[in-house]
């Protein structure tokens, strides 16, 4: 406390203005008056000095146009309030404006001043307005335009000028003040004459902590100063005279050069306040005084630093460079050589870099973003010294398929390496490692297969490879419930942008992949108009067009088109945007329908560019997603700090990105003010509405040279702004941004500064070792710096350079050791500072890939395949390899695969190319940091601060149908070509019609190649059935059978159809079909799905095919359709205790609503109160490995059960070997969630610490070790240390949302004590201290855990007292009380019973607790994983306890008897007649669980949760399900509410069979949800605000895991398409909590879905 008081006193004394000097220094004014300001001194001044031809041109352009006043506003110009009148056409500059335009102050009379006319002759300006004045502005009708037009009448308007509050602040947030080139520290002042400034030097040992807490803010609040100023010493206090011009915001410099206390090396904090004022918060800035420029290139293992003089750009020798961690400890240091270069080891803990010499200090924060190099072509795969090329035959799989991965290991130059094992990790979409294996090569090829579970989570999966260098390589693949496409669709527009007057046309080509045109097929689609903000790909980040323009985003038209006999068509739309001045794009989203309604969807875009050139704007600060209170939506837009300067890059560019020269760009800063009010209407009640007022805050003119990027900056306060740039051709571009909104930021957006660009040009397309590179370097300005040749491992060559205005030509010899392909040339050129011109140092960067690819090592691979073949035949691929020089390569290995193009087209899969992988351009491998973005500029432009992350939940709602999808994928074994470079591979092709892409990869020890070819697979007559993905019992559907004659002869065919399984034909099948050559016909087949769960099958026999010279057998085809019940599965539970002689029978109506064929059950009979251990194991086994708690809970049964025990319980389990392997995997997963401090987090080690779960997981790991599993000692030790910390320092625990923090901490401490005591590692003193806080316990469980720990460690007395108290302390039954221990009354009782039995304590109390627990468990229909595991642990300890019983049952003629509980699995017939009689002389406990599918929709129900479903069209309007046509898109809107916070809600919306999801994870092949109407966009905005953890698009359901806050509705939206005509039952939507399963809801039932053709 004493230190805090001292710091506070020091700050107060400092703020009192105690000057160390007798005379206050005077601030230096550095802003030279602008030409406009000078002109203001004349009576009627004009800055418009135009030549006669220029005047004539302007007059001609405005000929015949009317003169009107467009705007009359107060604007800030050169820091002063200015009245600006904007006219529609140029004014005559020769008239006396003071005679025709008058400004009168209502209080003081006429306002004196001179009118200034802008260069474009359209704006009149009157400067230096007084604040808070009512001004009457009168414009006489005599005002004359250049074309001689005049006002029709006099104009008068009253405006009130803004209030001006005295203000002062630092004008730069840069941290480096180059004293040799900048005279002082810049400040911005308005009507403040004197300031007191206090300078603090940050203590060296506190520097990293200070920087971390400072966060580069621009003010220091009093409450922040207590903590921050403890880390700094006050070294100087001074008063400075500013004396800015009255009512004018001026930039001035505080002279620091003669202040001796600031000449000591260090980092300083300046805190400023207006003299004589004491504010809650004061302007502050952090800076160092230094001439040392620093740039750093950060690689994987090293850090290369270059130091230069800010004064002259020369390399600086003898600079001491140090790396510091966040604790201020020096990690490593070195001194720069003659070239200014320092090499340091890259330490992941490095937070700061300090460069010091002769009292100067430069600070580089390595925690800030690296330099943004988006404008450079530096993309590619990462470069490594060991290259591991991973590839497969495809990157899209369905759950249940087997993933295939191949790999080649080479060095950086593609040369073979010795064989070595490589570790592969299979990673789920949630980031969890599912399996780790070690792969060994065979003949140089690594091969790995991974069978996906049938319920594998959908999304993006990864296989991660580690070659031993701990640099991970990733191979990504999709897992989705997709259907292979049968057709191809090509949509094309014009490649170059159109003008706004042009008609937009898209050509359409559709064909079946087996070769026939899609003639007669329907094309449905939509045409959308959208603004094209980032319109120029060559200028990333620049936005073009007026963001305030209205009606630029809308749906243009719906498309319905039938393709011609060649499968072609055209879609066109006339321009409805001829007057636009902003870039636009027309998007055509087209869906080509099969005869059964299933689509193939593609998109095409047509750009529209409205002028020769347009202004482009790029903010120099980050865009972030924030909640916009004005629109009640989440928006992404740039965010800048309140009270700072908002800086922007400006270009004037054509559509190709060529920067044009321009004079007179008008740049305006506009504040968007909204005045809200309430409005009442009969239809909508009270609605919040607003009036928007655009206030012009500031304005300046900008001239740009060709190929120049201009920069502007403006001071901003809190609020919403728009920056607007208007070109001489009237084109306007604008961007919106927020100031002062970062506190509501909910993203990790970071503003990485883009540097100016150095242009690098090479003299050759590629080089070889021994060549000489001729490099031309052209910098924006002359300067010094360095040029480098870099690899991903570090620099290979560098040289100091001096670039003149005309550029520099440099020769670089290519060293023969540069045998790698991740090389880049990079340059940094620094413009030296110049005090005389107030020019601060400025940096430009160049990066260019250095190609060293050797075409001589490319294998030419020829594939000979048939152009066409029939199904059910082998495909032989002949291969021939050769080299560029014609020689026959030796020992060529080839891997051949053939894959259905209908799979590859969905993801645009590119045939893997090993040559490109090893020799192609790699990603630039360095992160560049430098201080040039932090230099404080003397003339006031703000320098930017920064240079430049399965599961059976799906079965909730019932098992999914089995979907039979024929996916053709064949990968042959590798073959070695013969001495002539030739070989062949034969692949079996089954019953498939379509297109195969044959892909081949070839390699030798040094050379590589690849190729592909297409093969059409088609029968002479093709029969393809179009059917829904599944059906529900009771559905009727109209299947379509397409029969295509691909022969050149007419065919008379007989088609016989039958159905079996769970399908029946509704009408007789067709008999005869006649087809001309090339003709396709469609047969309609009505079917009905029967009750049950399983498959239905359609069989077709096609006979009569006549082929010349062939005897053709009948063609037999079968298609299976998965059938499931229409409504979610339900469970009923019965239980009783029968006394001797009593009989129990199932109630007559108990199973009445169940479909008999789906009904199954389990009967448990026991001589003691039963716990259904089989149920608990099943539920835990069914639960996915997910978060920390789920993973641990799911593993416990595998510790204590084996395959024989599971079989005895009626559970299908894995072998003991697989069971032990799954535990090993689970342990690995748990350890991935262990934090560095030994605790555990919920999802990964970077998450927040979970205190109770840390004890829970440590309990499991200790038990696993006891059961013989390998648990790393280090992990156990670190976990134990963390548990010990819980015992000894409970104050360090922060448990969010805990309703009883003391009880939560007591629960954590007690469990930690038990786990440590189990290992004899719990300090008895700590246990006794916890016992003293026993009154904090909110449940008996922690008291029992503490009691067992006390007894174990030797304090039997306190232990027994704790155990006795535990049995008298029930848990509060209110589930809404959160204690942070994942508990419930049921869970606690179960763990207490388990503890008592494990430790052989109180057998009578055990029996009482068992009886209570049995009743509790029986009453719970749904259990959390915590409860299931606790019940398992309790049941496993008591299942062997004796309890004789005897029973007679209706399903067994023999009498049943036993001493242990017995489970019997029952079918539907046994269940509906079930009777049980107690034929023994002891009580008999009975539990019966039956589950099945209801025959009718369940009634809506809700407990805590509530769910509603709405069906909309893509226009956002309500749509009925009984009036859809095949191909129609519908939007499904789910709204979920909760009366308590539910962080783990799982939403399952089962689909009716006639609808199919448009999978947004497969954007290339699905209709886009984003391309919808305005109402739909509002719903999408609401959805963006939801905390959605996971979304899945399945064959028969939409699934989302989402957090639902109390009384805050969650919106979920998905897109579906009506496909197969028919009548379908509509299931209800469901939602439930995964941890409190009784919190659940079922939505209202819907009418039938009717899909018409």
Curated annotation (Swiss-Prot):
It is found in: Cell inner membrane. Residues 1559-1589 form a coiled coil. GO terms for molecular function: endopeptidase inhibitor activity; protein homodimerization activity. InterPro entries: A2M_bMG2, A2M_N_BRD, A2MG_CUB, A2MG_MG1, A2MG_proteobact, Alpha-macroglob_thiol-ester_cl, Alpha-macroglobulin_TED, Alpha_2_Macroglob_MG3. It is a lipid-anchor. It comes from the Bacteria. There is a cross-link at residues 1187-1190 (Isoglutamyl cysteine thioester (Cys-Gln)). A lipid is attached at residue 18 (S-diacylglycerol cysteine). PROSITE patterns: PROKAR_LIPOPROTEIN (PS51257). GO terms for cellular component: extracellular space; plasma membrane. Cleavage causes major structural rearrangement of more than half the 13-domain structure from a native to a compact induced form. May form homooligomers. This is Alpha-2-macroglobulin. The gene is yfhM.
């Amino acid at each position: 406390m004493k230190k805090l008081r001292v710091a506070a006193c020091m700050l107060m004394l400092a703020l009192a203005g105690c000057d160390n000097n007798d005379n206050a220094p005077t601030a230096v004014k550095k802003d030279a008056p602008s030409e406009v300001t000078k002109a203001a001194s004349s009576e009627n001044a004009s800055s418009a000095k135009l030549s006669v031809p220029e005047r004539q041109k302007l007059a001609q352009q405005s000929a015949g146009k009317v003169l009107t006043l467009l705007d009359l506003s107060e604007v800030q110009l050169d820091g002063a309030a200015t009245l600006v009148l904007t006219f529609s056409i140029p004014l005559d500059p020769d008239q006396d404006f003071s005679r025709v335009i008058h400004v009168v102050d209502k209080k003081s009379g006429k306002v004196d001043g001179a009118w200034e006319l802008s260069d474009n002759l359209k704006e009149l300006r009157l400067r230096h307005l007084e604040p808070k004045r009512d001004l009457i502005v009168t414009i006489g009708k005599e005002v004359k335009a250049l074309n001689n037009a005049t006002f029709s009448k006099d104009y008068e308007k009253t405006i009130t000028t803004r209030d001006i509050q005295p203000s002062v602040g630092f004008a730069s947030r840069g941290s480096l003040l180059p004293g040799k080139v900048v005279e002082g520290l810049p400040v911005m002042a308005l009507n403040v004459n004197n300031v007191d400034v206090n300078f603090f030097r940050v203590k060296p040992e506190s520097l990293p902590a200070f920087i971390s807490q400072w966060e580069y803010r621009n003010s220091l609040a009093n409450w922040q100063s207590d903590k921050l100023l403890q880390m700094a010493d006050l070294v100087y206090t001074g008063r400075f005279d500013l004396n800015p011009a009255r009512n004018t915001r001026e930039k001035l410099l505080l002279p620091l050069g003669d202040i001796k206390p600031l000449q000591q090396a260090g980092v300083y904090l300046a805190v400023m306040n207006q003299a004589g004022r004491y504010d809650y918060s004061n302007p502050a800035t952090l800076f160092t005084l230094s001439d040392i420029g620093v740039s750093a290139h950060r690689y994987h293992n090293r850090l290369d630093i270059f130091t230069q003089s800010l004064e002259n750009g020369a390399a600086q020798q003898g600079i001491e460079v140090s790396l510091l961690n966040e604790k201020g400890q020096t990690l490593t240091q070195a001194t720069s050589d003659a070239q200014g270069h320092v090499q340091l080891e890259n330490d992941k803990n490095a937070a700061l870099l300090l460069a010091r010499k002769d009292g100067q200090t430069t600070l580089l924060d390595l925690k800030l973003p690296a330099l943004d190099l988006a404008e450079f072509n530096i993309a590619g795969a990462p470069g490594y010294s060991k290259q591991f090329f991973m590839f497969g035959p495809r990157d899209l799989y369905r759950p249940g398929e087997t993933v295939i991965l191949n790999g080649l290991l080479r060095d950086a130059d593609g040369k073979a390496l010795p064989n070595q094992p490589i570790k592969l990790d299979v990673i789920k979409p949630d980031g969890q490692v599912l399996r780790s294996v070690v792969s060994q090569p065979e003949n140089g090829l690594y091969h790995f297969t991974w069978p996906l579970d049938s319920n594998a989570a959908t999304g993006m999966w990864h296989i991660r490879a580690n070659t031993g260098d701990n640099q991970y390589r990733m191979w990504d693949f999709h897992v989705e419930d997709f259907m292979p496409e049968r057709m191809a669709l090509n949509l094309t527009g014009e490649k170059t942008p159109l003008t706004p007057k042009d008609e937009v046309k898209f050509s359409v080509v559709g064909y079946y992949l087996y070769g026939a045109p899609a003639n007669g097929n329907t094309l449905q689609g939509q045409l959308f108009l959208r603004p094209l903000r980032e319109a120029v790909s060559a200028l990333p980040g620049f936005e073009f067009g007026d963001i305030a323009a209205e009606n630029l985003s809308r749906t243009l038209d719906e498309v319905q088109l039938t393709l011609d006999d060649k499968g072609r068509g055209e879609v066109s739309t006339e321009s409805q945007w001829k007057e636009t001045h902003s870039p636009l794009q027309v998007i055509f989203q087209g869906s080509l329908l099969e005869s059964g309604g299933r689509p193939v969807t593609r998109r095409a875009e047509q750009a529209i560019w409205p002028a020769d050139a347009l202004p482009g704007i790029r903010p120099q600060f980050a865009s972030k997603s924030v909640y916009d209170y004005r629109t009640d939506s989440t928006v992404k837009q740039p965010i800048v700090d309140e009270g700072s300067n908002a800086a922007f890059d400006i270009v004037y560019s054509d559509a190709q990105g060529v920067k044009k020269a321009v004079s007179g760009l008008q740049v305006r800063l506009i504040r968007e003010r909204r005045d809200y009010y309430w409005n009442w209407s009969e239809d909508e009640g009270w609605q919040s509405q607003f009036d928007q007022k655009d206030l012009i805050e500031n304005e300046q003119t900008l001239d740009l040279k060709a190929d120049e990027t201009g920069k502007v900056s403006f001071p901003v306060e809190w609020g919403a702004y728009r920056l607007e740039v208007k070109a001489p051709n009237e084109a306007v571009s604008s961007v919106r941004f927020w100031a002062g909104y970062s506190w509501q930021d909910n993203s990790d957006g970071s503003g990485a500064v883009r540097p100016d660009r150095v242009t690098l040009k090479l003299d050759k397309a590629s080089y070889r070792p021994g060549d000489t590179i001729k490099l031309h370097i052209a910098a924006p300005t002359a300067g010094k710096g360095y040029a480098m040749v870099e690899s991903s491992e570090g620099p290979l060559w560098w040289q100091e350079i001096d670039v003149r205005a005309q550029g520099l030509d440099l020769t670089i010899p290519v060293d023969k050791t540069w045998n790698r392909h991740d090389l880049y040339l990079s340059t940094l050129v620094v413009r030296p500072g110049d005090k005389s011109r107030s020019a601060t140092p400025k940096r430009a960067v160049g990066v260019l890939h250095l190609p060293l690819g050797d075409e001589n090592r490319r294998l030419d691979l020829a594939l000979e395949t048939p152009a066409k073949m029939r199904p059910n035949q082998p495909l032989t691929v002949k291969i021939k390899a050769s080299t560029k020089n014609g020689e026959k390569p030796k020992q060529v290995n080839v891997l051949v695969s053939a894959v259905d193009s209908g799979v590859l087209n969905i993801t645009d899969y590119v045939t893997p190319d090993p040559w490109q992988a090893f020799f192609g351009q790699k990603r630039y491998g360095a992160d560049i940091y430098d201080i040039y973005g932090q230099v404080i500029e003397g003339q006031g432009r703000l320098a930017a601060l920064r240079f430049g992350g399965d599961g059976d939940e799906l079965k909730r709602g019932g098992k999914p149908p089995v979907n039979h999808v024929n996916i053709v994928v064949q990968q042959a074994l590798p073959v070695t070509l013969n001495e002539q470079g030739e070989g062949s591979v034969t692949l079996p092709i089954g019953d498939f019609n379509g297109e195969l892409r044959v892909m081949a990869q070839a390699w030798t020890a040094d050379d590589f190649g690849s190729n592909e070819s297409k093969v059409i697979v088609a029968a002479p007559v093709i029969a393809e059935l179009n059917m829904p993905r599944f059906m529900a019992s009771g559905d009727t559907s109209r299947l379509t059978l397409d029969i295509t004659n691909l022969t050149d002869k007419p065919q008379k065919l007989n088609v016989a159809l039958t159905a079996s399984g769970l399908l029946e034909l509704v009408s007789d099948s067709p008999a005869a079909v006649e087809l001309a050559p090339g003709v396709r016909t469609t047969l309609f087949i009505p079917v009905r799905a029967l009750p049950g769960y399983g498959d239905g099958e359609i069989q077709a026999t096609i006979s009569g095919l006549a082929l010349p010279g062939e005897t053709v057998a009948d063609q037999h085809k079968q298609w299976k359709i998965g059938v499931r019940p229409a409504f979610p599965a339900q469970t009923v539970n019965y239980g009783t205790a029968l006394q001797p002689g009593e009989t129990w029978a199932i109630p007559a109506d108990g199973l009445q609503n169940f479909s008999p064929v789906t009904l199954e059950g389990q009967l448990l009979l026991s001589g003691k109160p039963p716990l259904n251990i089989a149920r608990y194991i099943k539920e835990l086994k069914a639960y996915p490995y997910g978060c920390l708690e789920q993973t641990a809970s799911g593993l416990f049964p595998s510790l204590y059960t084996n395959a024989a025990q599971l079989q005895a319980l009626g559970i299908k389990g894995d072998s003991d070997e697989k069971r032990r392997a799954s535990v090993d995997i689970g342990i690995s997963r748990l350890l991935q969630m262990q934090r560095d401090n030994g605790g555990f987090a919920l999802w990964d080690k970077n998450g927040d610490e979970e205190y109770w779960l840390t004890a829970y997981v440590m309990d499991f790991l200790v038990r696993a070790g006891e059961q013989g599993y390998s648990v790393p000692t280090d992990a156990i030790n670190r976990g134990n240390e963390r548990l010990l910390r819980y015992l000894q320092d409970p104050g360090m625990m922060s448990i969010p949302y805990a309703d009883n923090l003391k009880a939560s901490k007591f629960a954590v401490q007690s469990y930690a004590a038990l786990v440590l005591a189990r290992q004899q590692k719990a300090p008895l003193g700590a246990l006794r201290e916890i016992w003293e806080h026993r009154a904090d316990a909110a449940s008996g469980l922690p008291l029992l855990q503490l009691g067992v720990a006390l007894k174990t460690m030797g304090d039997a007395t306190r232990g027994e007292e704790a155990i006795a108290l535990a049995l008298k302390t029930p848990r509060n039954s209110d589930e809404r009380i959160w204690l942070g221990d994942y508990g419930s009354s049921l869970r606690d009782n179960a763990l207490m019973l388990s503890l008592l039995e494990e430790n052989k304590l109180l057998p009578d109390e055990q029996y009482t607790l068992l009886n209570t627990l049995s009743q509790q468990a029986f009453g719970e229909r749904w259990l959390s994983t915590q409860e299931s595991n606790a019940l398992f642990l309790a049941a496993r300890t008591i299942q062997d306890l004796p309890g004789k019983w005897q029973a007679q049952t209706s399903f067994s003629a023999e009498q049943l008897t036993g001493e242990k509980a017995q489970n019997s699995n029952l079918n539907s017939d046994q269940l509906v007649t079930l009777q049980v009689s107690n034929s023994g002389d002891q009580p008999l406990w009975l539990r019966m669980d039956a589950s099945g599918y209801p025959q009718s929709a369940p009634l809506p129900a809700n407990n805590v949760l509530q769910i509603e479903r709405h069906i909309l069209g893509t226009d956002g309007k309500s749509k009925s399900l009984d009036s859809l046509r095949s191909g129609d898109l519908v939007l499904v809107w789910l709204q979920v509410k909760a009366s308590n916070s539910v962080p783990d809600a799982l939403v399952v919306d089962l689909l009716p069979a006639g609808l199919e999801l448009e999978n947004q994870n497969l954007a290339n092949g699905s209709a886009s949800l984003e391309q919808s109407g305005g109402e739909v966009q509002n719903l999408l905005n609401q959805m963006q605000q939801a905390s959605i953890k996971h979304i899945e698009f399945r064959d028969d359901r939409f699934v989302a895991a989402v957090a639902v806050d109390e009384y805050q509705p969650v919106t979920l939206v998905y897109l579906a398409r009506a496909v197969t005509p028919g009548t379908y039952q509509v299931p209800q939507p469901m939602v439930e909590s995964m941890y409190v399963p009784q919190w659940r809801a079922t939505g209202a039932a819907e009418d039938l879905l009717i899909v018409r053709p």
